[in-house]
Regions:
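Aromatic-rich peripheral "rim/lid" segments of glycoside hydrolase catalytic domains that contact
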Residues: 279, 293, 298-323, 327-375
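Aromatic-lined glycan-binding groove of carbohydrate-active enzymes
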Residues: 240, 249-260, 269-270, 276-301
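Aromatic-lined substrate-binding rim segments of carbohydrate-active enzymes
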Residues: 80-137, 201-220, 224, 277, ...
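Hydrophobic faces of well-ordered beta-strands that scaffold small-molecule active sites
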Residues: 56-58, 94-96, 126-128, 179-183, ...
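Bacterial N-terminal signal peptides
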Residues: 12-25
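Active-site beta-loop-alpha junctions enriched in small/polar residues
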Residues: 61-63, 99, 131-133, 183-188, ...
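Active-site cleft segment of glycoside hydrolase catalytic domains centered on the general acid/base Glu
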Residues: 109-110, 139-248, 253, 268-277, ...
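Boundary/entry segment of secreted carbohydrate-active catalytic domains
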Residues: 48-79
Length: 375
């Protein structure tokens, strides 16, 4: 009897492992490695430009707020709108975050629509970053929006779907359909806590992600479907990356692009990032983007007593970005698709990581993307 029970248990484990292997194989099949071309505004008759080999991007979610205060950005001593400076220096994508009812952060739907319109007019492609929160969303803070806080799981799933669909519809109707949509921000620990908190609630988390993905797809109307990015904060950690994306695939969450944050004081060395890029490319066979990065241009305590890999100077900052771009481009099978700098125009405590000095003059790092395109 016990032998029969053991054989039954052993056979059950074998079947479960086979199911997981099949699901993982399904998830790792390439969905096409080309990031789609920019979608022209409905008021523009010209065809979209051919997709560049590499994404040179920036999160510019604070820019409009800063310029509305009268801050003027300069390049070589000449004042220009911030977006024009970036475009002139080789940037080709912008990332915009969207929150539900942010206070005091500015990133409402209307604010983001204005940013998107200005960016698209200059030829930028758009990555829209849904936080699904009223405040910052990151692995330590994934607070459910106040208006959704008391919803049971089923209602929360509906709210995520409708909010995402309505937002994408508004962008589409304005003629600024996003090229890529990020469902959640640094969601290594889940999102919309406590309902979608990991590691304990994978099924609920998967439901929430799928609701956002369906909302993005249904909001597109007749436009091309935006690529779906899933973003975590494990640039130099292949072990946690494997845990997260393997579970995502087993839970059958469809996605197109892997996004990683990489800040060297938190996520390790460039060599650790390189190893993880190789791991992701070989295991998941999907495009990979370092969707958040930065480096200080003046002394700071970010490394907490450890020696920084580059000097914390304007030139050291530029050297870091140049080496990061090279590292991502070396990803196997051409799957390293881009880099986004997190907030080139910033104030306060994070100004030391921006691309402009205290007088709002462009630092050497602004030139790195343009130089990389000439190599």
């Amino acid at each position: 009897m016990y032998r029969h029970l053991f054989l039954f248990w052993k056979w059950g484990c074998y079947v479960w492992l086979m199911i997981c292997s099949v699901l993982l194989a399904m998830g790792t099949q390439s969905i096409g490695q080309t990031i789609p071309p920019a979608q022209a505004s409905s008021s523009t008759a010209s065809a979209p430009a051919k997709q560049p080999y590499f994404i040179y991007g920036a999160d510019v979610s604070f820019l409009q707020q800063m310029e509305s205060k009268g801050i003027a950005f300069k390049d070589n001593g000449q004042v220009h709108p911030g977006l024009e400076i970036l475009r002139h220096n080789g940037f080709n994508w912008v990332r915009l975050r969207i929150m539900n009812e942010p206070t005091p952060l500015p990133n409402t739907l209307q604010y983001s629509l204005v940013e998107a319109k200005a960016a698209r007019a200059l030829g930028f492609r758009i990555l829209l970053d849904f936080h699904y929160s009223d405040d910052w969303a990151d692995p330590a803070h994934e607070k459910t929006p106040a208006a959704w806080a008391k919803m049971p799981h089923e209602e929360l799933v509906k709210a995520v779907y409708q909010f995402t669909k309505d937002t994408i519809t508004a962008f589409r109707e304005q003629g600024t359909m996003p090229d890529m949509v990020q469902i959640g921000n640094e969601i290594t620990s889940g999102m919309l806590w406590p309902d979608g908190r990991l590691p304990d609630r994978w099924p609920q988390f998967a439901d929430l992600l799928e609701a956002g993905i369906r909302g993005a797809n249904d909001g597109k109307g007749a436009e091309q479907r935006p690529l779906i990015m899933i973003h975590i904060d494990q640039g130099g950690n292949d072990e946690t990356t494997k845990w997260f994306f393997d579970n995502l695939i087993v839970n059958r969450v469809p996605f197109d692009v892997i996004g990683q944050s990489y800040y060297p004081w938190w996520q390790g060395s460039l060599n650790e990032l390189k190893n993880n890029l190789e791991f992701m490319a070989n295991r998941y066979k999907k495009p990979i983007i370092v969707v958040e990065t930065a480096y200080d241009w003046r002394d700071s305590e970010d490394f907490k007593g450890r020696k920084p890999p580059y000097t914390q100077t304007p030139q050291g900052q530029a050297d870091f970005l140049g080496m990061l771009v090279n590292t991502v481009k070396q990803t196997p099978n051409g799957l390293g698709k881009g880099v986004f700098w997190w907030e080139p125009m910033a104030e306060g405590a994070i100004a030391k990581r921006g691309m402009f000095d205290d007088h709002h003059e462009a630092l050497p790092v602004v030139k790195v993307f343009g130089s990389a395109q000439q190599q």
